[in-house]
C-alpha cells in the first residue's frame, strides 16, 4: 500500500474517532439543554470577500457546542428565508429547551424574522442581543463625537509610532510594564481599553522619551519624533481630554469585566448596567445627562430583556440587599418570564405563588445556611441547595440563571475553515462535502473544549489537530 494512501486512511480513522467523541459530547450536552435550558447563539460574520455567514452554537452551564455554519449571503435581506433558517435551528435544538437566542445582528430583517419565529412557537423563549456587542455599539456612539474622535486620533498616532518601529518597541518594554494595545476582538472596546492604558502609562512614556537611549538614537532628531514627543510631554489639553473620555468609557468596559468574572452573569447584568451609569455620573460630577440618555437608548432598544430583570430579582445577593428596588420594570420582567418559560418545565401559577415565599424570605430561604451562602456559592447552586421547597420557582430560577449574556466574540474564533467549506462546495462531491462538514464540526468543538472566553480574546490550551 502506498504511503499517501496510508496517511489518508490514518487521517480518516482519526477524524472518525474524534467525530464519535464529539457526538457523545453533544448527546450529553443535549440532556443538560433539556434539564436547565440553553442559549442558542447566532454569530453573524462576514468573510474578507464580503459574503455573509451565521455560525450556530449552543451554550449551557456544561459548555459551548458548535452545531453548524450557514452561508446566508443570498437570504440576509429576505425575511421569509431568514425565518425559515431560524425555524430549522429552533427545531434542531428544541423550542422548549431554549431560554434565549442571542444574536449580534441588529438589522431590521433579522428583527422582523425574530418576531415571526416567536409568534410561530407562541413565545416559549426570548431573543436577546449579545451584551458585548451592545456595549461595543454604545462605545461606537461615544467614539463618533467630535471631541472624542480627536482624542482617539492623537492616541492612535502615539501607539502607531511606538508599535511600528523597533527602538520605541524595545524601550516600551523597559519603561511600560503593561501592554498598551488591547487585543479584544470588539473594535471599540479595544479602542477604549487602549486609551485607558495609554493615559495610565503617560509618566512612563515621558521617561522613555527623556531617556539617554532615546536621546542618542537617530529617531531623536526626526520630525515625526518631535511631533509624537510633543504630544506625550507637553500636550496637556490632549491628556486632560483623554482622561475625561476614560471617565465615561471605563465604567462600561469594567461592566463587561464584571460579567466575565461571575459564573452567573444573567443574575448581575441589570445591576452591572445600573452601577456603570452611577459610576459615570460620579466621574463627571453630575454632567452625565447626554451619556445616560444614549445608554438608555441602547439598553431599551437593543439589550434589555425580561430575562435580565428576572435574573436581577432571582439573584439572592441582590434581592436580599438594601439596594434592591422592586420597580415596574422588574415586576413586568419576572411576570413575563414566569408565564413564557413555564409552558413545559414548571407551572407558572405555582411559580408565581412560590415567588411570595422567596420575596418574604420564608421557609428554607430564611435558614442560616441560606443566608451564609448568599455570597459564598454561585446563584444556581444556591437555588439547588435552598429552593427545593419551592420546586417550580427553583426550576425557573435555575433555567434563567444558568444562561449567558454573551455571544461567541469572547472565544475569538477563526471561522476561516467554515468559509472554505462554503466557498468550495460546488467543486466537491457529496461525500467530500460531508467529510468537510465533519471536519468543521470536530474542529470547532475541539477548539471550544479547550478555549476560555475572555474580553481580550480567548485563551487557548492544547494543540488543535482536527482539520
Predicted regions and their residues:
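Short alpha-helical patches at protein termini and domain edges
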Residues: 1-467
Amino acid at each position: 500500500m502506498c504511503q499517501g494512501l496510508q496517511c489518508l486512511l490514518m487521517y480518516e480513522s482519526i477524524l472518525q474517532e474524534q467525530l464519535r467523541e464529539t457526538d457523545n459530547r453533544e448527546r450529553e450536552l443535549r440532556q443538560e439543554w433539556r434539564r436547565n435550558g440553553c442559549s442558542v447563539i447566532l454569530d453573524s460574520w462576514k468573510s474578507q470577500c464580503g459574503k455573509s455567514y451565521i455560525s450556530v452554537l449552543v451554550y449551557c452551564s456544561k459548555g459551548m457546542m458548535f452545531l453548524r455554519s450557514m452561508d446566508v449571503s443570498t437570504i440576509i435581506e429576505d425575511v421569509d428565508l431568514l425565518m425559515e433558517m431560524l425555524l430549522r435551528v429552533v427545531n434542531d435544538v428544541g423550542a422548549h429547551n431554549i431560554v434565549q437566542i442571542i444574536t449580534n445582528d441588529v438589522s431590521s430583517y433579522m428583527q422582523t424574522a425574530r418576531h415571526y419565529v416567536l409568534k410561530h412557537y407562541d413565545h416559549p423563549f426570548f431573543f436577546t442581543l449579545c451584551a458585548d456587542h451592545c456595549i461595543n455599539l454604545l462605545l461606537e456612539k461615544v467614539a463618533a463625537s467630535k471631541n472624542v474622535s480627536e482624542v482617539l486620533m492623537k492616541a492612535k498616532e502615539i501607539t502607531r509610532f511606538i508599535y511600528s518601529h523597533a527602538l520605541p518597541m524595545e524601550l516600551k518594554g523597559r519603561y511600560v510594564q503593561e501592554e498598551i494595545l488591547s487585543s479584544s476582538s470588539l473594535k471599540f472596546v479595544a479602542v477604549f481599553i487602549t486609551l485607558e492604558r495609554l493615559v495610565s502609562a503617560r509618566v512612563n512614556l515621558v521617561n522613555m522619551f527623556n531617556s539617554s537611549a532615546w536621546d542618542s538614537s537617530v529617531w531623536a532628531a526626526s520630525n515625526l519624533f518631535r511631533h509624537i514627543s510633543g504630544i506625550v510631554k507637553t500636550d496637556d489639553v490632549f491628556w486632560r481630554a483623554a482622561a475625561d473620555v476614560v471617565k465615561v468609557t471605563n465604567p462600561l468596559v469594567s461592566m463587561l469585566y464584571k460579567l466575565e468574572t461571575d459564573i452567573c452573569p444573567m443574575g448581575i447584568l441589570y445591576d452591572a448596567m445600573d452601577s456603570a451609569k452611577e459610576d459615570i455620573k460620579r466621574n463627571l460630577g453630575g454632567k452625565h445627562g447626554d451619556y445616560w440618555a444614549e445608554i438608555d437608548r441602547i439598553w431599551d432598544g437593543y439589550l434589555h430583556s425580561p430575562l435580565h430583570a428576572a435574573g436581577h430579582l432571582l439573584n439572592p445577593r441582590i434581592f436580599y440587599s438594601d439596594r434592591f428596588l422592586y420597580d415596574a420594570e422588574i415586576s413586568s420582567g419576572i411576570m413575563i418570564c414566569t408565564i413564557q418559560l413555564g409552558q413545559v418545565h414548571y407551572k407558572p401559577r405555582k411559580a408565581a405563588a412560590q415567588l411570595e415565599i422567596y420575596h418574604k424570605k420564608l421557609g428554607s430561604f430564611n435558614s442560616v445556611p441560606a443566608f451564609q451562602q448568599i455570597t459564598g456559592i454561585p446563584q444556581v447552586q444556591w437555588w439547588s441547595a435552598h429552593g427545593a421547597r419551592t420546586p417550580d420557582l427553583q426550576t425557573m430560577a435555575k433555567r434563567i440563571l444558568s444562561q449567558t449574556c454573551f455571544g461567541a466574540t469572547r472565544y475569538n474564533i477563526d471561522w476561516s475553515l467554515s468559509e472554505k467549506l462554503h466557498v468550495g462546495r460546488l467543486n466537491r462531491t457529496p461525500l467530500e462535502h460531508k467529510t468537510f462538514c465533519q471536519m468543521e464540526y470536530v474542529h470547532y468543538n475541539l477548539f471550544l473544549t479547550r478555549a476560555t472566553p475572555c474580553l481580550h480574546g480567548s485563551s487557548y490550551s492544547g494543540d488543535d489537530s482536527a482539520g
